[in-house]
Curated annotation (Swiss-Prot):
Protein name stated in the entry: Putative pterin-4-alpha-carbinolamine dehydratase
Lineage of origin: Bacteria, Pseudomonadati, Pseudomonadota, Betaproteobacteria, Burkholderiales
Pfam families found in the cross-reference section: Pterin_4a (PF01329)
Catalytic activity: (4aS,6R)-4a-hydroxy-L-erythro-5,6,7,8-tetrahydrobiopterin = (6R)-L-erythro-6,7-dihydrobiopterin + H2O
UniProt keywords, alphabetically: Lyase
Organism: Burkholderia orbicola (strain MC0-3)
GO terms, biological process: tetrahydrobiopterin biosynthetic process
Signal peptide: none
Matches recorded under PANTHER family: PTERIN-4-ALPHA-CARBINOLAMINE DEHYDRATASE
Family of this protein: Belongs to the pterin-4-alpha-carbinolamine dehydratase family.
Gene Ontology molecular functions: 4-alpha-hydroxytetrahydrobiopterin dehydratase activity
Amino acid sequence: MIHKLTSEERKTRLEDLPHWTAVAGRDAIQRRLRFADFNEAFGFMTRVAIKAQEMNHHPEWFNVYNRVDITLSTHDADGLTERDIELARFIDGAAAHAQPGA
C-alpha cells in the first residue's frame, strides 16, 4: 500500500521544492512553467513522460503553446506521496531552464 504523507512529512518535503504550490481543495501540488516556444515545452513534456512511465506514476498536466501546468497527487493514496515528491524533483531538474509560468 502506498503511504500518504502526513502533514509534517508534506511540510518537510515541500521545503526542498520552492517552485511547487498546494492545490486548493486537494492534497496535491502544482507547478506552472513557461518555455521559449512550443518545441521546448513539448521536449520537456516528453522527458517527463518517459520518467513518469518508468515510475508508473503519471502527472496531470495541461499544455498551451509554451506553457505547461503540472499537478501531482497519488490517486491510489488519495493525496501526496513520496512518488509525487520524486517526480517533482525530476521535473525541477528537467525544467531548470524554464521560467515560472504566468
